[in-house]
A protein has these predicted regions:
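Acetyl-CoA-dependent GNAT
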Residues: 2-4, 15, 24-98, 107-109, ...
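Conserved catalytic-core motifs of GNAT/GCN5-like acyltransferases
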Residues: 125-126, 138, 143-160
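Terminal substrate-recognition subdomain of acyl/acetyltransferases
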Residues: 1-16, 150, 154-175
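Active-site nucleophile-adjacent alpha helix/oxyanion-hole segment immediately C-terminal to the catalytic cysteine
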Residues: 171-231, 236-252, 303
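Active-site-adjacent substructure of cysteine-protease-like catalytic cores
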Residues: 266-343
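Noncatalytic regulatory segments and standalone regulatory/sensor domains
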Residues: 169, 305-306, 316-318, 322-328, ...
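Conserved hydrophobic beta-strand within the GNAT/NAT acetyltransferase core sheet
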Residues: 88, 122-126
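Short glycine/proline-centered loop/turn elements that form peptide/ligand docking sites
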Residues: 107, 130-133, 150-155
Length: 401
């Protein structure tokens, strides 16, 4: 529990008799936090409801600095189940108390809160025209890794910054091609969205990300039924869709049994899923895709990434979303301890793309989540450009076998 009196050497620009406290934010602080929002921001202000949710129900930590009983600044840090990623969700200092080291102290406290939850990255967004904040972050060791266009209500861009917190491994994930991010637009298109990201990384000039391709890939690879509602996509259908577009693809799965069959109860639905699956298997025979009856460890995936392949992996969503549904993600990089993952699902309004990109997940944790259902189904695709494409650019064969 954070409850620290600020040391004398950190009291720059403050009256000598001021009492300064850094502590956890509480619901009773919400009126003061709303007043700071009003004074700091012309648009995109947090509401009372948002503050209450973030301080009481969300997977988040609120921090405030208090001067002689008055809240003068705050930081909100959100965390993401199943990952080692934190986000500086919101951060503000009352204009009348700037230049006193408040922002620097709150930022350091936010980083410590992230470390205490075993997070290795803290990410944030900042307005491109907020020069003072950008200077603060860069002096604190943050690096820019992207831009959101038209992000704020007034259409200003947001710079995306991140800082690595204390992990002794490589300073950046080791990976092959740079994988762009695409957010799924329908509940049942995680598989197509994951496949789109991988294909775009390998053949950027040939693949155009958008809903037309997302829905087309779903039509080509859906199991028709799965759990409830529209069917999702299985490994065999996704592999066929990739092979049709000229990619080399390996399917790593224990056997050729119909996947997700235990997710439906109706015998009629089960029969339809079997017919669809048998048709996929027939088409695979002449597609160039390879079925390998084995499963990949997290280290196998890391090795494949280092060799230029892109793994698309089936996981159970429970460890991230606390709901049991099958979900596809893309492995974008690896280091000695973590796999880094693009998750196409942005779950609710309190999350953004930045929360789902290159999510660091400990390898042991990833192996536990990379299985689904009572049958503990494990499935992964390794996607590469065709052999002729790799030979032309001198790339190495990235086989994980």
């Amino acid at each position: 529990m954070l409850d620290n009196t600020v040391s004398s050497d950190s009291r720059q620009g403050l009256p000598g008799d001021a009492t300064i406290l850094l502590r956890q934010a509480q619901p009773a602080d919400i009126p003061a936090l709303l007043a700071i929002e009003e004074r700091c921001f012309a648009t995109d202000r947090l509401t009372r409801r948002s503050f209450h949710y973030l301080l009481t129900k969300a997977k988040a930590t609120g921090l405030v600095e208090v001067h002689s009983g008055t809240v003068v600044g705050y930081a909100l840090v959100s965390f993401h189940s199943g990952t080692s990623l934190a986000r500086l969700y919101s951060f503000a200092v009352d204009p009348g108390h700037r230049g006193q080291g408040v922002a620097k102290r709150l930022l350091a406290a936010a980083e410590q809160a992230a470390r205490s939850r075993d997070c290795i990255y803290l990410r944030l967004e900042v307005r491109r025209d907020n020069a003072a904040a950008i200077d603060l972050y860069k002096k604190a060791g943050y690096r820019e890794f992207g831009v959101y266009t038209d992000y704020y209500e007034d259409h200003m861009e947001a710079l995306r910054l991140e800082k690595r917190l204390g992990h002794s491994g490589p300073s950046a994930p080791l990976g092959g091609p740079l994988v762009p991010y695409y957010q799924q637009t329908l509940d049942f298109t995680c598989g197509p969205s994951a496949l789109m990201m991988a294909m775009k990384a390998l053949k950027p000039a040939e693949i155009e990300l958008g809903r037309k391709l997302e829905i087309r890939l779903w039509r080509e690879s859906t199991t028709v039924f799965m759990t409830s509602g529209h069917g999702g996509c299985g490994p065999f259908g996704l592999a066929l869709a990739a092979a049709r577009r000229g990619f080399a693809v390996d399917i790593h799965i224990k056997d050729n049994a119909t996947p997700f069959l235990d997710s439906v109860r109706s015998d009629e639905k089960k029969e339809v899923m079997r017919i669809v699956h048998e048709d996929f298997l027939d088409e695979l025979e002449g597609s160039g895709a390879t079925v390998r009856h084995n499963t990949l460890s997290a280290q196998d995936m890391a090795d494949a990434v280092a060799g230029g392949a892109i793994p698309i992996v089936l996981i159970s969503s429970y460890r991230i979303y606390h709901e049991k549904f099958p979900h596809w993600v893309v492995v974008t990089g690896a280091d000695d301890r973590f796999l880094y993952v693009h998750d196409p699902l942005v779950y609710d309004r309190h999350h953004a793309h930045i929360d789902r990109m290159n999510m660091p997940i400990p390898k042991a944790d990833f192996e536990r989540m990379a299985r689904y259902g009572k049958a503990q189904l494990k499935a992964a695709l390794l996607l590469r450009p065709q052999l002729s494409d790799r030979a032309a650019d001198g790339s190495a064969d990235g086989s994980a076998d």
